[in-house]
């Protein structure tokens, strides 16, 4: 009888373990060189990032575009630049394209459907001229950072206004 209960406990615990969702952390940086992190031989210690790379999965062959907005759109949609239509950074709110097309479903929307909590920290740069482009309307429950391509480090302004 003890063996039967131990077997049941083992099966249930392995089933529960198999149903645990892994944590997903994506770090996307602009202009980060291969050797800028210490686990790739960089001179500046990056122990926390090194630990994440050691314990997690490093995907280091993601090629999309040499500028930020198309790269972010490719990562979030899983589409090539010519399929998602974001071909340049969103710099001018009066330009013909002011944000990533809202009809494109992106990674945080899928993750929310799968029961994940989603958050964005840092640079969005996929549209800010209309509320439909904002990260909190694209699947991120929380967004802490800035919407434009770059801000002042000390005053958090872009183009003379707070971002």
Predicted regions and their residues:
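Formylglycine-dependent sulfatase
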Residues: 2, 16-163
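Sec-dependent N-terminal signal peptides
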Residues: 3-12
